């Protein structure tokens, strides 16, 4: 046991001369010395940890900094012992592959030779010297990042120009670009465009079509470059089409190809919709009345018209041979034709038919889908034509003309565009056969009068 004594004087003891009140119980004027006793045990003494103790035999200190080791020389082993004259001899005779003698140029620079001097001694221009040095460096970076000797060996002959063009790309981009160059057999101009396209692609965010091309595919980057250039030309134009075809030729992703095909050939669905609308507009502009004959309509008609009938597949000859004039005379209105004919049809005297006079003829078609310019109903038709009005005059009128397999109807504007001046006759009426399940007997709401 340890005993500690200390005299403790109170800092609060104050003199009575200052006029301050002093408590005689808690603050004695002259305090007596006070003895403080306590016991220090072994548990209170901190133990020294072995972890904090210095070992008797400390381990050897590790070397934190490795000594400087200069990079290996880029000069091939067989050329390292050459002097300047030997290096110049190798360069002048091109006595190795281009990437093997390219480091000799840098070595000569170190020896004090200037590019013009080397050009004079070796015949390698200053521009070519730079291309060889940079191309060799690009080749080394690709060689260190891949394990495909077939790819890098493809640049053994004449590869300096191609590799020089992709010098500004990252190592990963260089590998992808080099692979694309070999696969597509791209020349130096194409390699230059490829490198420029890869570097420029991120800056084109927001441009038309940007999202349809894949930045990770070098072919898509080059394709997008050509696509942007195509938009600088008029649409349509040969220059624009040529650039789009060039872009389609190098595109890799399906999304990019679809975009370019749409630009070249249009959207198929949009084209179908456009064609449908065009056909609807043509139907609205047609000035031919189309009627469906009703059962018993001829019998109930107060007046009728009799017309000779020709089959469409019989062609032009039968149309010309058909009787031109049919006369009904006498008290009983006996019909008399100028010559005999096999087939006749009786129709109500509708205004378009009654206005024909002479020269009328009815041509029978087996399938309306091959005749009408709109969707047919797969049924036969009778087309009434006026052979007297055979001159093509009305742009919006329809005329009976000769086709490959017989006869057909064609619009006047189309005939004029082909400089066709005459036809077999102008169409005045199209008649559908009677049918019980069709109450809409008049399919065209034209005012015949």
From Swiss-Prot:
GO biological process: ribulose bisphosphate carboxylase complex assembly
Transit peptide interval: 1-61
Parts forming coiled coils: 262-288
Highest taxon of the lineage: Eukaryota
Start and end residues of each stretch annotated as N-terminal alpha-helix: 75-264
Stretches that traverse the bilayer: none
Gene Ontology, cellular component aspect: chloroplast; chloroplast stroma; cytosol
Keywords of this entry: Chaperone, Chloroplast, Coiled coil, Plastid, Transit peptide
InterPro entries: RAF1, Raf1_C, Raf1_HTH, Raf1_N
Cellular localisation: Plastid, Chloroplast
Region (C-terminal beta sheet) location: 288-434
One Pfam family recorded for the sequence: Raf1_N
Domain-related comment: Has 3 domains, the N-terminal alpha-helical domain, an extended flexible linker and the C-terminal beta-sheet domain. The N-terminal alpha-helical domain stabilizes RbcL dimers and RbcL dimer-dimer interactions, facilitating RbcL(8) formation. The C-terminal beta-sheet domain probably dimerizes Raf1. The 2 C-terminal beta-sheet domains are swapped and pack against each other to form the dimer interface.
Cited function: Required for assembly or stability of RuBisCO. Acts at a postchaperonin step to fold and/or assemble the large subunit (rbcL) into RuBisCO. RAF1 brackets an rbcL dimer (rbcL(2)), leading to rbcL(8)-RAF1(4) complex formation. In the next step, RBCS displaces RAF1, thus resulting in holoenzyme formation.
Similarity-based family: Belongs to the RAF family.
Description of how the protein assembles with itself and partners: Homodimer.
Name of the protein in question: Rubisco accumulation factor 1.2, chloroplastic
Gene name, Swiss-Prot/TrEMBL: RAF1.2
């Amino acid at each position: 046991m340890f005993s500690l004594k200390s005299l403790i004087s109170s800092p609060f003891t104050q003199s009575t001369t200052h006029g301050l009140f002093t408590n005689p119980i808690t603050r004695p004027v002259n305090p007596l010395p006070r003895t403080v006793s306590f016991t220090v045990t072994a548990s209170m003494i901190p133990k020294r940890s072995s972890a904090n103790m210095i070992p008797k035999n400390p381990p050897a200190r590790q070397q934190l900094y490795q000594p400087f080791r200069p990079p290996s020389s880029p000069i091939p082993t067989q050329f390292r012992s050459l002097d300047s004259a030997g290096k110049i001899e190798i360069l002048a005779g091109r006595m190795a592959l281009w990437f093997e003698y390219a480091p000799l140029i840098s070595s000569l620079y170190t020896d004090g030779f200037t590019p013009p001097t080397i050009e004079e001694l070796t015949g390698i221009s200053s521009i070519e010297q730079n291309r060889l040095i940079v191309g060799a460096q690009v080749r080394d970076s690709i060689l260190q990042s891949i394990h495909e000797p077939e790819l890098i060996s493809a640049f053994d002959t004449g590869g300096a120009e191609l590799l020089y063009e992709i010098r500004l790309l990252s190592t990963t981009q260089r590998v992808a670009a080099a692979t694309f160059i070999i696969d597509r057999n791209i020349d130096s101009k194409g390699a230059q465009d490829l490198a420029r396209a890869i570097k420029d692609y991120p800056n084109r965010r927001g441009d038309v079509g940007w999202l349809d091309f894949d930045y990770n595919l070098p072919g898509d980057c080059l394709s997008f470059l050509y696509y942007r250039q195509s938009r600088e030309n008029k649409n349509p134009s040969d220059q624009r089409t040529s650039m789009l075809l060039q872009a389609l030729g190098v595109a890799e992703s399906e999304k990019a190809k679809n975009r370019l095909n749409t630009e070249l050939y249009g959207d198929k669905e949009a084209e179908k919709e456009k064609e449908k609308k065009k056909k609807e507009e043509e139907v609205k502009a047609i000035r031919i009345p189309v009627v469906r004959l009703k059962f018993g309509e001829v019998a109930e008609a107060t007046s009728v018209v009799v017309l000779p009938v020709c089959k469409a597949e019989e062609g032009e000859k039968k149309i010309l041979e058909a009787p031109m004039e049919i006369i009904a005379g006498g008290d009983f209105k006996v019909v008399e034709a100028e010559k005999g004919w096999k087939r006749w049809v009786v129709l109500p005297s509708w205004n378009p038919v009654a206005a024909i006079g002479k020269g009328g003829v009815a041509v029978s078609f087996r399938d309306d889908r091959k005749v009408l310019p709109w969707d047919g109903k797969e049924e036969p038709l009778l087309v009434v034509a006026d052979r007297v009005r055979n001159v093509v005059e009305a742009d919006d009128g329809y005329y009976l003309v000769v086709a490959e397999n017989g006869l057909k109807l064609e619009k006047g504007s189309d005939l004029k565009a082909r400089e066709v001046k005459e036809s077999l006759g102008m169409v005045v009426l199209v008649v559908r056969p009677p049918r019980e399940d069709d109450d809409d007997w008049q399919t065209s709401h034209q005012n015949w009068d």
